[in-house]
Amino acid sequence: MATYEETAHKIIKDAIKSAIFIDENAKEPYSDDKPQETDRSIALYNQFKDNGISLSVYKYSNTNYLTHKDYIFANRDLVLLDWKLEGEDHGGEKSLELLDEIVNRQRHIHFCVIYTSEKEDYVLKNILSYFSGSTKAEYEDFKIDLADKEEEIKEIMPILNELSLKRFTDWKVLYNEIRRSKRELLSYILENIVCDSSLCSLIKCGMAFDNDTIKSNIQEPCPSSIDCVLHTLCIENTIIIILNKEDVNPDILFQKFGETISTYRWGVMQLAGLEMQNIQKKNCSFIDENILRVTRKALGYHRNEDFDNFEDFLRNVMLEQQALNLRDEKLTLVEAIDREPYDEKLQEEYTSMNVFYNSVCLKKNKPISFGDVFRCDGEYYICITALCDCARPGKRNNSFYFAKGTSITCNDALKIGDGGFISYLNNNEYVKWNLKSSSDEPVYIVPESLLVPCNLIVDQKIEVEKLVFENGVSKIKTYVFEYVTTIKQNYTQRIANHAFTHPVRVGIDFVKKK
């Protein structure tokens, strides 16, 4: 049986099939000129081809970049990016702008290599200062606020720089060294740079007074992993490797990516996603012989049958086709993961797993649908209206069914497990949907019918009307529901099934012991 590391290496190799090499001195195919990186361009092209990877070569020009952006990034798995673009003396700024594009907008690209003739540590420091959660203007403000202590801060700059690199590993030793020798300075820094943690405040202090690194003009996400030995890091869902120019070849890349994701604490689910993506590319299709027997005219007739949301219907059919195709495929990653006993220290990770299994937050404006969860006045509501009725609200006069829930603790949610009717909305919110006062009483989920005049969720909010009784008088009251997340279909269906048995319950009487 393959080890976890061997499995990771194979998954990554299968995941990278389309790459692009970006350098201002690259030699593009069919070009007569012979720029500085001609030999490297040809060598890389052949090396990647021998490994079953299609490599495109792009000669970077700031003038043409926006015109060619779709060509550069569309359907790429890997980007090889020169650290110095457009003849920059010290390099970095243009490359970091492209890295921003990859990390924040080209989210299908999971792998990036920055190759350089500079020292790898220097490039890593610049990436960390650019992707740090603070802007160039904010760092200038930090320097002004801490100006009185600038000389003292400069004395501990080596420790602050090391803290940044080792923030996920050996930071406590370095932090305690500052606390022991510079307690007053530490308090002063923490007062002026307010962050989620003392460690973060110190890292930002070091970056503010490092005049040799590049800062971003906008807020960028922070890394979730840094390896200062391998010179690798993870930002969002992108793994970034910094390599010397002479070391750029597919074998070294696969080895480095494999080592990085194998040692990355959160890498296992990234590998699971990559393997599913590999299986989907290789073996699964939205099209089979039955669908190829359908003409545009026949499909048009089905659409014409009073089908307001035919697009949703067709998309769901295609997704179910894909799910059935994937159902029997083997995940090699599972065999490489050892079985483990319950560990109280991992409660936060167990919770994150349940959030992933249970829900997905959809940020865009959309019509209300089956499984959508809302928050209002400290209570929670989940839409349990059938999908077909959600798609055509007019057929039910815009009346929607909801179940109402209350907040519970993370510990209680984990104790209940799949034996109750609970939902993991995110890492901070957990909801119980059933009404039950004691263990001897039956579990009830009571459906509520609410009027939704406009079924579109806009800016995460939707208005709902409810019939209420105040002082014996009935009236319609309007509430603003705030969208939280969407519970996945099978979990919502379980809640809905139980809720709709409530109206058909039958009351009986027995003599019972008190």
PLM features per residue range, with description:
Residues 1-297, 388-514:
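Extended charged low-complexity segments that act as oligomerization/scaffolding linkers
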Residues 2, 49, 308-314, 357, ...:
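Compositionally biased, low-structure terminal segments
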Residues 17-19, 24, 356-377:
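Short coil-to-beta transition motif at edge beta-strands of beta-rich domains
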Residues 281-350:
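Charged, compositionally biased non-catalytic regions
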Residues 320, 326-369, 485, 489-512:
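Mixed-charge, Lys/Arg-rich low-complexity intrinsically disordered regions
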Residues 378-387:
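Short beta-strand-centered aromatic/proline hotspots
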